[in-house]
Structures are given as C-alpha cells and as structure tokens.
Amino acid sequence: MAKQDSQTEGISIDSDLINFLNASPTAFHAIDEAKKRLKHSGYVQVSERDDWKLELGKRYFFTRNHSTIVAFAIGKKYVAGNGFYVVGAHTDSPCIKLKPVSKVTKSGYLEVGVQPYGGGLWHTWFDRDLAVAGRVIVREEKHGSVSYSHRLVRIEEPIMRVPTLAIHLDRNVNTDGFKVNTQSHLLPVLATSVKAELSKVVAENGTVGNDEETDGMKSSKGTTNANSKHHSLLLQMIAGQIGCNGSDICDFELQACDTQPSVIAGAAKEFIFSGRLDNLCMSFCSLKALIDATASDSHLENESGVRMVALFDHEEVGSDSAQGAGSPVMFDALSRITSTFNSDSKLLRKAIQKSFLVSADMAHALHPNYADKHEENHQPRMHGGLVIKHNANQRYATNSVTSFLFKEIASKHNLPVQDFVVRNDMPCGSTIGPILASGVGIRTVDVGAPQLSMHSIREMCAVDDVKYSYEHFKAFFEDFSHLDSKITVDM
C-alpha cells in the first residue's frame, strides 16, 4: 500500500501549493520536490538507462535531465495495448539565466551577465530583490578516484538587483513606455568593485585574492578555474552553499530568482501571489491528483489502464530539447511500459489510440483593467474552474470529442468549467498539447486554471481554481476509462 505523504497530511491544498512553489525556484528544484513527494507516496524510481521490471498495481517514476519527470501507476487489470490517461504540464518559467561567462565589471560595479529565457515581462524584473538558484557540476575526489556529481544550489538571501533608471534621467518613460534592452539594461548588480576588493576571497590554494588576482587560475588538475568566467564573490557563495571548494565547481546552470515568497493573499485571502504559477500551479495540481488517485492499492484494483503525469522542461522556449515535450520522452514512456508486458509492437499503436492527454497550462483570466483584450463571449473568470482552450488553427489541440469528455467529468463531479478562444485580431499562444498530439498521435484537450500577470516575475491566481483543478484532474484519473468506453468515434 502507498504511504500517506507526511509532507502534505492535514495541509490545505492552497497551503500545500505554497510549500511546493517556495521549494521550487527552478525546474531542477521542482523535479526534486516532485521526487520527494512521489517517494513518500510509495512510487519507485526507475532509470531510462536500465531495463524495467514493472508490476501490475505498482507505482513508478523516472526523470530526464532532472528537469523533466514522468510518474505512472499501472492498474491491476492492465494488459498491454490498453490506454494511458495522462496529465501533462511543464516545469519551466520565464527567467533570466546566467551566461557561460557571467563576469561583468562596469562603471565601478560587479554585474552578472544574464540572458533572457522565454517570453518574460522583463520590466517586472527591475527593482526586485534577487537571489540565485540552479544546479552545479562538482568534481569529487576520494581515495585517488575522481567523479562528478550534479548538486542543486539555492542562495536564498537577496544578493543582486536590477535597478531602474531614475525618472529624472528618463523624463519621458511614463509617456513613451519602459523599453527594456535585455542586453544592456537587464544585468543585475552584485556588488561594487571597491567592496568586492575589500571583501577578499579565499582561493582553494589558501592564498587570498580578489577577482582580478584569481583570473585564469588553474585547478590542481589543469582545468581553467571558474574564477576566469564568473565573479569569485559569487562562486564563493555557491561553494559555501553546497559545501565544496570553489575550484571544484566545473560548470553550472543558474538563474536569478525573486526572493519574495509565495503567499495566500487578498483582502478575502482568495488569491495566490507568486512567481512561476505558469506552470508550477498545474504541475502541482496534476502531481497531487495522481498521488491521491493512486494512494492505496484499492485505487488501482479495477483500473485497466495506466494513470500518468508528465512534467516537461523547456515549454517556454518551444519544447525542442532532449527533455522537452518535442522529444521522444512521452513516446518512450508509453513504449517501454507497453513492451514490458508484451513485446508485440502492434500493441503500442493500439494503446495510443485508447489513450488521452490533458495538456494543463495556465490560462488568461479576464483582466478588469484590460477587458477589451478578451473576446466578448469567452472571458474566463477567477473562481470559475479550469478553462478549456480552443483554437481553429490548432494552436490548442482541443476538439469537440476531447472537450466533451473533459466537460462530462466536470458535470459528474459538479465542477465548474469555462471555454476560451483568443480574439481573432490577436495572435494565439500554444502549449505542449499540439506538440504531443501530433508527435505521439494521442487525443488531447488543452486546459488551464485562469490567472493574471502571466510571465511576470509575480503572478496571481485564485485559491478556488487550485482546488477545482486538483479535483478535476483526480476525477479524470478515476473516471476516464469508464467514460471513454461510452463514446465511439472511429469504428
């Protein structure tokens, strides 16, 4: 029997989401948090590098690049060729990431070279108290043997800031607009050169030096020291966080993070104010729904399919990576599970046609100050439940069949649901839905909880919609196989 997750027992779903968000400043940390929750709930980790030995009625997960995760529970009545019932979301959000050479010294300041990731509202990153988080590749030597590990790092205190230009030096900013040049304006300030020089850095060899003195240093094994690429002041903080010498840092993927924690807010405590709601809110709701829909052996007793959640990286930049939705990761998961029980390749093709994907990505709520940005008959409201997204040009993968099935689940469980199409005179965004629908051939509905300030450093959604999303996804896992048997489209 799966264990009750001690991390979430007795905690309201909105508070649990807050915990998830605050533990997940990056996609790497979100996957780490997801792994902890799955393991607490009896899920067993498998590796794509190994052969799989799967059993009916058991729960498993695997990760790719530690930024994508696929978790699944196999019904006790499953046979190869039966369907997969999947909720897919993504772990990444727009942010500013450190460049491979981030050391910038300019006008008496130490700045950090960054590049924008995704389509962020970059003006919202100005005048925020910023920290750094991500993953670091560390060299380890034990008993003369060298190995390398990846470690997650998070500096929680505010160490950087992107300051705006005073209005006295830009008199027309309020009339002409705040125009951000992401190459020259978006660099966070780390320290002044004078203070950095006074606050000397202890190098690995025991000498004391500043950035200029340690430039080009070599480690004991001859590799270029990271001080030649990054401010030693920053490296010292990273090394201190993960408990290694600065010279053992081989490489990293780091990003700037807002230090303000996620909160339940509003005069009626009805909102969640947070970064990365797009799309960690849907990632959390789908993950919790899967865990709770498979919490005991009895939940899988009469299940003839496989219940699955897939959380992908790199949606915000097109999904074309080894761990994005455009990669074979979804197809690989379906294929490996099916072939574990029967190697006949025809069964996978049958299974895909019996499968269903809920592509879950946050939706645009009607904005009270910009109501004209929504089509008059399609205005999703907060507290209105999940939004089903439609687009005639297939920017969303929803069709009448997939929309009907998802609405039927809502109707059975008395859950609200809404519809959305973008205005005809505005471009339409997209999701992992069309990518997986076309790449795998799986029936798909695109949905999402309504939110405001999408792609800002600080977004907002409604507490009620978190609850509705979780309940809708959980009902999908529990009811879909029975509901799907009642509709026939292709004979």
Curated annotation (Swiss-Prot):
One Gene Ontology biological process: proteolysis
Binding site for Zn(2+) 2: D278, E316, H455
Catalytic activity: Release of an N-terminal aspartate or glutamate from a peptide, with a preference for aspartate
Cofactor: Zn(2+)
Cofactor info, note text: Binds 2 Zn(2+) ions per subunit.
GO cellular component, one term: cytoplasm
The keyword Transport belongs to this UniProt entry's keyword annotation: no
Record's subcellular location: Cytoplasm
Chain positions recorded as substrate binding sites: H168, E315, D361, H364, K389, Y396
Keywords attached to this entry: Aminopeptidase, Cytoplasm, Hydrolase, Metal-binding, Metalloprotease, Protease, Zinc
Cited Gene3D superfamilies: Aminopeptidase i, Domain 2 (2.30.250.10), Zn peptidases (3.40.630.10)
S-S bonds: none
UniProt enzyme class: hydrolase
Protein family: Belongs to the peptidase M18 family.
Oligomer status and interactors: Tetrahedron-shaped homododecamer built from six homodimers.
Protein name: Probable aspartyl aminopeptidase
Organism for this UniProt entry: Ricinus communis (Castor bean)
